[in-house]
Amino acid sequence: MEKNVKSSVTGISSQVSTHQLETKTQFTKYHTRGGHGFAAEDANAMYDRLQGKKVDMCGRDNALNGADRIVDGVKIQTKYCQSAQCSFSKAFDTTGQYRYSGMKLEVPSDQYAEVVTKMKEAINQGRVPGVTDPNQATQIVTKGKYTYAQAKQIAKPGNIESLKFDLTTQAAACAFACGISAGITFFIELQKGATYGDALKEAAKVGGKTGGLALLGSVASQQFLRTTIGRNCAAAATKAVKPAVQAAMKTEVGKNVITKTASVMAGKQVFGSAATNVVTKALRTNAVVSSVMFVATTVPDVVNVCRGKMTAGEAVENAACNASGIGGGCSGASAGAAVGTMLCPGIGTVVGGIVGGIAGGIGGSTAMKKLISLFK
């Protein structure tokens, strides 16, 4: 039962991880020429959230001269360039006027002092509309939490800065997996007649293992998607799932489910092709994340086979059950979330996803075990 719980919760965790990737990062742009700028936006936004601030990543609409994000009602434009002069000049239009009136200009922490000096000069020159006091430069320019070099590293795979960023953004998936698996295990142990103390010990053990596995898989997924191979896999997944989403949009029920699900994910009302794109991207990312999660659950068994602690047959059986559990968990979570969204967007989405994921994951893993037993 422990393995069933772990595989099903891992499947649900991949959904949580996908949600974090799609809503909290712009990972698909990290590999571009200005990818470090998007990484800087994401990293600084993450820091704001950790401080308990409300963050709206409004800049994804690419509005001309619009804010990249709004933090507790304050509009912020992020400029992370190679030099302070470049970061500063990017905030001014071709006529030499400050482009982002009423917004704070966020720059790399190591360029802050120099940009403030340049902003004071611009104010004295009358190039900042509505501002005449050069001392207000410190109120316009805000110090980013990361240096230019750190932002460059966050956009790339396989380094300390990007790993730290991924660990932080995916902590939610880990905590979710740990809590859900511990709760299920505790209930199962009590049903089996265990004492509260023993049930808590087993719940803590299973929860810790599952949470750690979820974190490993989530971080590995985020790192993998930064690589060329990862991006190619994501592109292939997009081609595979998009026709299905488009076909579903042609039915009334499918259109309703996709529109509501996309709106919950986007945090605002989206319709038509916009809703199709949101759901397609989520399914694409989830396909990659689930695959990485499967590898993460399989590697320990491969190691045990090499050490002689497990037979190859047992490893294959576990792999098949893990695949079924993760797949069932993902499918169940998706279906449950869709139904929950139709009934009550938001709360219904979460509850439906959890219930559907657990049922689908345990059901898939159990069914695979029974199928394998027929050939023994």
Feature locations, PLM:
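Glycine-rich, hydrophobic membrane-spanning regions of integral membrane proteins that mediate transport
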Residues: 1-34, 43-61, 69-75, 81-291, ...
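Short, surface-exposed, charge-dense and proline/glycine-enriched linear segments
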Residues: 84-98, 346, 360, 364-372
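Helix-termini ("caps") and immediately adjacent flexible loops/tails
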Residues: 294-310, 315-325, 357-376
